[in-house]
Protein backbone atom coordinates (compact mmCIF):
# COMPACT_ATOMS: atom_id res chain seq x y z
CA UNK A 1 0.00 0.00 0.00
CA UNK A 2 1.26 3.47 -0.91
CA UNK A 3 2.04 5.28 2.34
CA UNK A 4 0.89 8.55 0.72
CA UNK A 5 -2.33 7.16 -0.80
CA UNK A 6 -4.47 9.11 1.67
CA UNK A 7 -2.43 12.20 2.64
CA UNK A 8 -5.33 13.97 4.37
CA UNK A 9 -7.54 11.35 6.01
CA UNK A 10 -10.91 12.25 7.46
CA UNK A 11 -10.37 14.14 10.69
CA UNK A 12 -12.68 15.00 13.55
CA UNK A 13 -13.00 18.17 15.55
CA UNK A 14 -15.75 16.81 17.78
CA UNK A 15 -13.68 14.65 20.13
CA UNK A 16 -15.06 14.49 23.66
CA UNK A 17 -12.93 14.49 26.78
CA UNK A 18 -14.36 11.07 27.61
CA UNK A 19 -13.16 9.63 24.30
CA UNK A 20 -9.69 11.08 24.76
CA UNK A 21 -9.49 9.85 28.35
CA UNK A 22 -10.46 6.38 27.12
CA UNK A 23 -7.57 6.45 24.65
CA UNK A 24 -5.12 7.35 27.41
CA UNK A 25 -6.48 4.44 29.47
CA UNK A 26 -6.03 1.79 26.76
CA UNK A 27 -3.51 -1.00 27.33
CA UNK A 28 -0.20 0.36 26.05
CA UNK A 29 0.13 -2.10 23.16
CA UNK A 30 -3.44 -1.44 22.00
CA UNK A 31 -2.85 2.31 22.10
CA UNK A 32 0.34 2.05 20.05
CA UNK A 33 -1.37 -0.26 17.54
CA UNK A 34 -4.13 2.31 16.98
CA UNK A 35 -1.64 5.16 16.76
CA UNK A 36 0.57 3.34 14.26
CA UNK A 37 -2.45 2.49 12.11
CA UNK A 38 -3.54 6.14 12.11
CA UNK A 39 0.00 7.20 11.29
CA UNK A 40 0.39 4.84 8.33
CA UNK A 41 -2.94 5.93 6.87
CA UNK A 42 -1.62 9.45 6.36
CA UNK A 43 2.17 9.46 6.50
CA UNK A 44 5.22 7.58 5.30
CA UNK A 45 5.84 4.98 7.99
CA UNK A 46 9.61 5.42 8.33
CA UNK A 47 10.25 9.05 7.48
CA UNK A 48 10.89 11.80 10.02
CA UNK A 49 11.05 15.49 9.27
CA UNK A 50 14.17 17.31 10.46
CA UNK A 51 13.68 20.88 11.64
CA UNK A 52 16.10 23.39 13.14
CA UNK A 53 15.09 26.04 15.67
CA UNK A 54 17.10 29.25 16.08
CA UNK A 55 16.61 31.91 18.74
CA UNK A 56 16.74 35.15 16.75
CA UNK A 57 16.07 37.27 19.84
CA UNK A 58 16.86 35.81 23.26
CA UNK A 59 15.62 36.77 26.72
CA UNK A 60 13.94 39.86 28.12
CA UNK A 61 10.40 38.63 27.53
CA UNK A 62 7.82 40.38 29.76
CA UNK A 63 5.58 37.29 29.97
CA UNK A 64 5.70 35.26 33.21
CA UNK A 65 5.53 31.73 31.75
CA UNK A 66 6.53 29.47 34.64
CA UNK A 67 8.49 27.11 32.39
CA UNK A 68 10.60 29.68 30.53
CA UNK A 69 14.10 30.89 31.33
CA UNK A 70 13.74 33.76 28.85
CA UNK A 71 11.18 35.55 31.02
CA UNK A 72 12.27 38.69 32.86
CA UNK A 73 10.55 37.13 35.88
CA UNK A 74 12.97 34.17 35.89
CA UNK A 75 16.20 34.37 37.88
CA UNK A 76 18.47 32.39 35.58
CA UNK A 77 21.11 34.95 34.71
CA UNK A 78 20.21 34.75 31.02
CA UNK A 79 21.25 37.94 29.24
CA UNK A 80 18.79 39.49 26.82
CA UNK A 81 19.93 40.10 23.25
CA UNK A 82 18.73 42.26 20.40
CA UNK A 83 17.14 40.87 17.24
CA UNK A 84 19.78 39.09 15.19
CA UNK A 85 21.07 40.57 11.96
CA UNK A 86 19.32 39.14 8.90
CA UNK A 87 22.60 37.99 7.38
CA UNK A 88 23.55 36.04 10.51
CA UNK A 89 20.15 34.33 10.55
CA UNK A 90 20.52 33.30 6.91
CA UNK A 91 24.00 31.93 7.60
CA UNK A 92 22.53 29.75 10.35
CA UNK A 93 19.77 28.63 8.00
CA UNK A 94 22.31 27.61 5.37
CA UNK A 95 24.20 25.56 7.94
CA UNK A 96 20.97 23.87 9.01
CA UNK A 97 20.10 23.07 5.39
CA UNK A 98 23.54 21.60 4.79
CA UNK A 99 23.09 19.44 7.91
CA UNK A 100 19.88 17.98 6.50
CA UNK A 101 17.12 20.16 7.96
CA UNK A 102 14.17 20.89 5.68
CA UNK A 103 12.38 23.36 7.93
CA UNK A 104 13.97 26.38 9.63
CA UNK A 105 12.15 27.80 12.63
CA UNK A 106 12.96 31.23 14.04
CA UNK A 107 11.91 32.20 17.55
CA UNK A 108 11.95 35.58 19.29
CA UNK A 109 11.36 36.10 23.02
CA UNK A 110 8.66 38.72 22.62
CA UNK A 111 5.13 39.15 23.93
CA UNK A 112 4.44 40.40 20.42
CA UNK A 113 6.60 41.79 17.60
CA UNK A 114 6.87 45.52 17.12
CA UNK A 115 6.00 46.89 13.69
CA UNK A 116 9.54 48.28 13.44
CA UNK A 117 10.90 44.73 13.51
CA UNK A 118 8.67 43.41 10.74
CA UNK A 119 10.86 44.44 7.75
CA UNK A 120 13.80 42.41 9.11
CA UNK A 121 11.49 39.48 9.90
CA UNK A 122 10.15 39.58 6.34
CA UNK A 123 13.68 39.50 4.92
CA UNK A 124 14.50 36.47 7.07
CA UNK A 125 11.46 34.59 5.77
CA UNK A 126 12.18 35.43 2.15
CA UNK A 127 15.85 34.55 2.47
CA UNK A 128 15.24 31.15 4.04
CA UNK A 129 12.61 30.28 1.44
CA UNK A 130 15.06 31.08 -1.33
CA UNK A 131 17.24 28.29 0.10
CA UNK A 132 14.44 25.79 -0.53
CA UNK A 133 13.55 25.34 3.13
CA UNK A 134 10.17 25.56 4.80
CA UNK A 135 9.91 28.53 7.14
CA UNK A 136 8.39 28.83 10.59
CA UNK A 137 8.27 31.75 13.00
CA UNK A 138 7.30 32.04 16.66
CA UNK A 139 7.18 35.68 17.72
CA UNK A 140 4.40 35.82 20.28
CA UNK A 141 0.96 37.30 19.71
CA UNK A 142 0.16 38.75 16.29
CA UNK A 143 -2.31 41.28 15.00
CA UNK A 144 -4.25 40.47 11.86
CA UNK A 145 -2.11 42.92 9.87
CA UNK A 146 1.12 41.32 11.11
CA UNK A 147 -0.13 37.86 10.17
CA UNK A 148 -0.97 39.09 6.67
CA UNK A 149 2.48 40.67 6.35
CA UNK A 150 4.09 37.33 7.22
CA UNK A 151 1.82 35.53 4.77
CA UNK A 152 2.74 37.95 2.00
CA UNK A 153 6.42 37.26 2.75
CA UNK A 154 5.78 33.56 2.14
CA UNK A 155 5.87 32.25 5.72
CA UNK A 156 4.87 28.58 5.70
CA UNK A 157 4.14 28.00 9.41
CA UNK A 158 3.54 30.06 12.51
CA UNK A 159 4.11 28.45 15.90
CA UNK A 160 1.91 29.55 18.77
CA UNK A 161 1.48 26.90 21.45
CA UNK A 162 -1.52 26.64 23.74
CA UNK A 163 0.99 25.51 26.40
CA UNK A 164 -1.36 23.44 28.57
CA UNK A 165 -5.02 22.62 29.22
CA UNK A 166 -7.31 25.69 29.21
CA UNK A 167 -8.48 25.05 32.77
CA UNK A 168 -4.89 25.00 34.02
CA UNK A 169 -3.60 27.92 32.02
CA UNK A 170 -3.53 30.52 34.79
CA UNK A 171 -1.48 28.16 36.96
CA UNK A 172 1.34 28.37 34.42
CA UNK A 173 0.99 31.88 32.96
CA UNK A 174 -0.79 34.98 34.28
CA UNK A 175 0.31 37.72 31.86
CA UNK A 176 -1.90 36.40 29.05
CA UNK A 177 -4.95 34.19 28.72
CA UNK A 178 -5.78 31.03 26.83
CA UNK A 179 -8.18 33.14 24.75
CA UNK A 180 -5.27 35.40 23.74
CA UNK A 181 -3.55 32.36 22.25
CA UNK A 182 -6.64 31.34 20.32
CA UNK A 183 -7.05 34.86 18.93
CA UNK A 184 -3.57 34.80 17.40
CA UNK A 185 -4.19 31.33 15.97
CA UNK A 186 -7.31 32.73 14.30
CA UNK A 187 -5.30 35.60 12.79
CA UNK A 188 -2.76 33.10 11.45
CA UNK A 189 -5.47 30.90 9.92
CA UNK A 190 -7.25 33.87 8.36
CA UNK A 191 -3.96 34.98 6.76
CA UNK A 192 -3.53 31.56 5.15
CA UNK A 193 -0.46 30.47 7.14
CA UNK A 194 -0.17 26.88 8.36
CA UNK A 195 -0.49 26.50 12.12
CA UNK A 196 2.10 24.89 14.39
CA UNK A 197 0.53 24.51 17.82
CA UNK A 198 1.17 22.17 20.73
CA UNK A 199 2.33 22.51 24.29
CA UNK A 200 4.34 21.18 27.20
CA UNK A 201 3.78 18.16 29.41
CA UNK A 202 5.60 17.31 32.61
CA UNK A 203 4.73 20.60 34.32
CA UNK A 204 3.25 18.85 37.34
CA UNK A 205 -0.08 18.29 35.63
CA UNK A 206 -2.32 15.24 35.98
CA UNK A 207 -3.39 12.88 33.23
CA UNK A 208 -6.75 14.68 33.25
CA UNK A 209 -4.86 17.87 32.41
CA UNK A 210 -3.15 16.11 29.51
CA UNK A 211 -6.58 14.99 28.32
CA UNK A 212 -7.67 18.65 28.43
CA UNK A 213 -4.57 19.72 26.52
CA UNK A 214 -5.13 17.22 23.68
CA UNK A 215 -8.87 17.98 23.68
CA UNK A 216 -8.20 21.70 23.18
CA UNK A 217 -6.03 20.96 20.14
CA UNK A 218 -8.16 18.21 18.63
CA UNK A 219 -11.34 20.29 18.79
CA UNK A 220 -9.94 23.32 16.98
CA UNK A 221 -12.02 23.97 13.82
CA UNK A 222 -8.96 23.00 11.75
CA UNK A 223 -6.27 20.87 13.35
CA UNK A 224 -2.76 22.33 13.50
CA UNK A 225 -0.62 21.15 10.60
CA UNK A 226 2.19 20.61 13.14
CA UNK A 227 1.75 19.59 16.78
CA UNK A 228 4.93 19.94 18.87
CA UNK A 229 4.90 17.91 22.08
CA UNK A 230 7.45 19.23 24.57
CA UNK A 231 8.60 17.60 27.79
CA UNK A 232 9.43 20.24 30.38
CA UNK A 233 13.12 20.96 30.79
CA UNK A 234 13.21 22.21 34.41
CA UNK A 235 15.56 25.19 34.62
CA UNK A 236 16.72 26.46 38.00
CA UNK A 237 15.47 29.99 38.54
CA UNK A 238 12.18 29.48 36.71
CA UNK A 239 8.97 29.04 38.70
CA UNK A 240 8.38 25.47 37.56
CA UNK A 241 12.06 24.55 37.60
CA UNK A 242 12.31 25.50 41.26
CA UNK A 243 8.90 24.08 42.19
CA UNK A 244 9.52 20.65 40.67
CA UNK A 245 13.23 20.30 41.49
CA UNK A 246 14.08 17.16 43.47
CA UNK A 247 10.50 15.87 43.25
CA UNK A 248 9.12 12.84 41.38
CA UNK A 249 7.39 15.33 39.08
CA UNK A 250 10.68 16.80 37.82
CA UNK A 251 10.50 14.52 34.76
CA UNK A 252 7.43 13.04 33.13
CA UNK A 253 7.31 9.24 33.03
CA UNK A 254 8.51 8.14 29.58
CA UNK A 255 5.62 5.71 29.05
CA UNK A 256 3.16 8.50 29.88
CA UNK A 257 4.93 10.78 27.41
CA UNK A 258 4.64 8.11 24.69
CA UNK A 259 0.94 7.76 25.53
CA UNK A 260 0.51 11.50 25.02
CA UNK A 261 2.20 11.32 21.61
CA UNK A 262 0.01 8.36 20.62
CA UNK A 263 -3.21 10.11 21.63
CA UNK A 264 -2.14 13.21 19.70
CA UNK A 265 -1.56 11.04 16.63
CA UNK A 266 -4.92 9.26 16.86
CA UNK A 267 -6.94 12.43 17.43
CA UNK A 268 -5.04 14.52 14.85
CA UNK A 269 -4.10 11.91 12.23
CA UNK A 270 -3.15 14.28 9.41
CA UNK A 271 -0.90 16.53 11.51
CA UNK A 272 2.85 16.30 11.88
CA UNK A 273 3.58 15.35 15.50
CA UNK A 274 6.94 16.74 16.58
CA UNK A 275 9.18 15.63 19.44
CA UNK A 276 10.44 18.94 20.73
CA UNK A 277 12.06 20.07 23.99
CA UNK A 278 13.13 17.44 26.49
CA UNK A 279 14.31 14.92 23.94
CA UNK A 280 17.93 15.20 25.03
CA UNK A 281 17.13 13.45 28.32
CA UNK A 282 15.01 10.70 26.74
CA UNK A 283 16.40 7.24 26.20
CA UNK A 284 16.77 5.99 22.64
CA UNK A 285 14.16 3.35 23.44
CA UNK A 286 11.66 6.01 24.51
CA UNK A 287 12.26 7.98 21.32
CA UNK A 288 11.80 4.81 19.27
CA UNK A 289 8.46 4.23 21.00
CA UNK A 290 7.47 7.82 20.21
CA UNK A 291 8.12 7.16 16.52
CA UNK A 292 6.06 3.98 16.81
CA UNK A 293 3.33 6.09 18.43
CA UNK A 294 3.23 8.40 15.43
CA UNK A 295 5.80 11.13 16.01
CA UNK A 296 7.27 12.05 12.64
CA UNK A 297 9.22 15.24 13.21
CA UNK A 298 12.08 16.32 15.45
CA UNK A 299 14.25 19.33 16.07
CA UNK A 300 17.88 18.67 15.23
CA UNK A 301 21.06 20.31 16.49
CA UNK A 302 22.60 20.80 19.91
CA UNK A 303 20.30 23.63 21.07
CA UNK A 304 16.59 24.41 21.20
CA UNK A 305 16.49 28.16 21.78
CA UNK A 306 18.37 28.18 25.12
CA UNK A 307 18.13 24.53 26.23
CA UNK A 308 20.16 21.49 25.21
CA UNK A 309 19.03 19.15 22.44
CA UNK A 310 20.00 15.61 21.46
CA UNK A 311 22.48 16.61 18.72
CA UNK A 312 22.93 15.58 15.09
CA UNK A 313 25.32 12.67 15.73
CA UNK A 314 23.04 10.97 18.24
CA UNK A 315 20.04 11.46 15.95
CA UNK A 316 21.85 10.03 12.93
CA UNK A 317 22.94 6.99 14.93
CA UNK A 318 19.40 6.41 16.21
CA UNK A 319 17.90 6.78 12.73
CA UNK A 320 20.37 4.22 11.39
CA UNK A 321 19.45 1.73 14.11
CA UNK A 322 15.73 2.22 13.47
CA UNK A 323 15.84 2.29 9.67
CA UNK A 324 14.33 5.77 9.69
CA UNK A 325 15.14 8.28 6.95
CA UNK A 326 14.85 12.09 6.89
CA UNK A 327 11.81 13.49 5.11
CA UNK A 328 12.29 15.61 1.99
CA UNK A 329 11.32 19.28 2.03
CA UNK A 330 7.96 20.28 0.57
CA UNK A 331 9.10 23.83 -0.11
CA UNK A 332 10.36 24.56 -3.61
CA UNK A 333 13.34 26.85 -4.15
CA UNK A 334 12.07 30.32 -4.94
CA UNK A 335 14.41 32.17 -7.26
CA UNK A 336 14.71 35.89 -6.79
CA UNK A 337 13.32 37.98 -9.65
CA UNK A 338 15.87 39.17 -12.16
Swiss-Prot record:
GO process terms (BP): biotin biosynthetic process
Binding site for [2Fe-2S] cluster: 105, 136, 196, 274
UniProt keyword annotation of Cell membrane present: no
PROSITE patterns: RADICAL_SAM (PS51918)
Keywords: 2Fe-2S, 4Fe-4S, Biotin biosynthesis, Iron, Iron-sulfur, Metal-binding, S-adenosyl-L-methionine, Transferase
Enzyme class per UniProt: transferase
Cofactor: [4Fe-4S] cluster; [2Fe-2S] cluster
Cofactor binding summary note: Binds 1 [4Fe-4S] cluster. The cluster is coordinated with 3 cysteines and an exchangeable S-adenosyl-L-methionine.
InterPro entries assigned to the protein according to its UniProt record, in alphabetical order: Aldolase_TIM (IPR013785), BATS_dom (IPR010722), Biotin_synth/BioAB (IPR002684), Biotin_synthase (IPR024177), Elp3/MiaA/NifB-like_rSAM (IPR006638), rSAM (IPR007197)
Name of the protein this chain belongs to: Biotin synthase
